[in-house]
């Protein structure tokens, strides 16, 4: 089980990403717009740099919803491989069967 502080930190990052998503997208569009003058684009770059670092979606980490484990997480289920295996063997995941060939 991951420390509760790490799980809370990820949740805080997720909220910051949501909060600044629209502003961030607008600034990125201004930076990429070649029709604007260099001064306007530079001002947009500086404004983008002033946003909180954790407002960047790439800083987020997928974690298991049961254990908080950061590695081996299946996006479709939101579970780490260990817990997904346990749940699948109990038959709680519809349509999932053990592979045989």
From Swiss-Prot:
Q: Which GO terms describe its cellular component?
A: cytoplasm; small ribosomal subunit
Q: Which domain of life is it from?
A: Bacteria
Q: What UniProt keywords are attached to this protein's entry? A: Ribonucleoprotein, Ribosomal protein, RNA-binding, rRNA-binding
Q: Which cysteines are joined by disulfide bonds?
A: none
The cross-references to SUPFAM superfamilies, in alphabetical order and at most eight, read: Glucocorticoid receptor-like (DNA-binding domain)
Q: Which Pfam families does UniProt cross-reference here?
A: Ribosomal_S14
Record-level Gene Ontology MF annotations: rRNA binding; structural constituent of ribosome
Q: Which Gene3D superfamilies match?
A: 1.10.287.1480
* Any GO BP annotation: translation
Q: Entry's InterPro entries?
A: Ribosomal_uS14, Ribosomal_uS14_bac/plastid, Ribosomal_uS14_CS
PANTHER family cross-referenced by the UniProt entry:
30S RIBOSOMAL PROTEIN S14, SMALL RIBOSOMAL SUBUNIT PROTEIN US14M
Q: Which family does it belong to?
A: Belongs to the universal ribosomal protein uS14 family.
Summary of the function given for this chain in its UniProt record: Binds 16S rRNA, required for the assembly of 30S particles and may also be responsible for determining the conformation of the 16S rRNA at the A site.
Subunit text: Part of the 30S ribosomal subunit. Contacts proteins S3 and S10.
- The protein depicted here goes by the name Small ribosomal subunit protein uS14
Q: Per the UniProt entry, what species is this protein from, by scientific name? A: Azoarcus sp. (strain BH72)
